[in-house]
Amino acid sequence: MSKAYQQAGVDINAGYEAVERMTSHVQRTMRKEVLGGLGGFGATFDLSQLNMKAPLLVSGTDGVGTKLKLAIDNDKHDTIGIDAVAMCVNDILTTGAEPLYFLDYIATNKVVPEVIEQIVKGVSDGCEETNTALIGGETAEMGEMYHEGEYDLAGFAVGAVEKDDYIDGSSVEPGQAIIGLESSGIHSNGYSLVRKLIQQSGIKLSEPFNQEQTFLDAFLKPTRLYVKPVLAVKSSIKIYAMTHITGGGFYENIPRALPEGITAKIDVTQFPTPAIFDWLQEQGNISTDEMYNIFNMGIGFTLVVDNNQVESTLEILNGQNIKAYKIGETVKGNEPIQLTGV
């Protein structure tokens, strides 16, 4: 390799090793529509093989926020990639789109092949679960931009939906049911506050949070992927609107999927709140109302369906091994959201 480049702080050989290590993980995500392999200047996906009449492409990009800091500080890198995938594919899923392919971007102080492999393993796990091809990516070594051991991770997802099946919430009417799908925990938002509360509490992350997991396990639990269960519902039931509950909780996300003059009336007694949120609320002395303005509180994704389809929807979701509840209904109104039972 170039001695000049090495003296400038870039280890090309480490980059080559990282690519070799990640290749087997990437290959298990491939779909038949992907043309060519790794190493090209651009990745190619053959849309014609989808046999869609009038496909719309839906794209999304996101990162994992300061949840990364917890992963880095505790040298646990194998699940944070799932979060990157979930944040992107869950977003584009709200339009009814099936995720097709994904690209990742990793920027780091120094390429450590073993760490890069673990990150990409997580990305590949998320892609494999959602039938999304990890079609390309970039790993950038930038020693002067990041402190030792640090990295950032972002993702980019593209999906497709038939034009006639595109979901934008515009046809939502009063009196329809809102179905909430359980979250796996905190997901990937609010971690600046979470990390502050961890530090403030004085706990050791290796301590047990409950009988099943440590505090670290609870805080780093990957964001749930909703692609398979939601597409299973969409295949047989008309969905009028969908929401991925991320930063801003219920207050900021649920109204985004509803037309003017329609609001969501949510009864928070209709679903359980995971214990991790109770712990955060107690540590921060945070009001319940504010908690719903920050976190997902146990519901990571919502669907709006007709009332006569509630039972069928819940049955399909149960068959997909995900707990779901009728958490509310759409009503006339101009306020962003109505929460009862808080």
From Swiss-Prot:
It is an enzyme of class 6 (ligase). Pathway: Purine metabolism; IMP biosynthesis via de novo pathway; 5-amino-1-(5-phospho-D-ribosyl)imidazole from N(2)-formyl-N(1)-(5-phospho-D-ribosyl)glycinamide: step 2/2. Gene3D superfamilies: PurM-like C-terminal domain, PurM-like, N-terminal domain. InterPro entries: PurM-like_C_dom, PurM-like_C_sf, PurM-like_N, PurM-like_N_sf, PurM_cligase. It is found in: Cytoplasm. GO terms for biological process: 'de novo' IMP biosynthetic process; adenine biosynthetic process. Keywords: ATP-binding, Cytoplasm, Ligase, Nucleotide-binding, Purine biosynthesis. Its main location: cytoplasm. SUPFAM superfamilies: PurM C-terminal domain-like (SSF56042), PurM N-terminal domain-like (SSF55326). It catalyses: 2-formamido-N(1)-(5-O-phospho-beta-D-ribosyl)acetamidine + ATP = 5-amino-1-(5-phospho-beta-D-ribosyl)imidazole + ADP + phosphate + H(+). GO terms for cellular component: cytosol. This is Phosphoribosylformylglycinamidine cyclo-ligase. It comes from Staphylococcus saprophyticus subsp. saprophyticus (strain ATCC 15305 / DSM 20229 / NCIMB 8711 / NCTC 7292 / S-41).
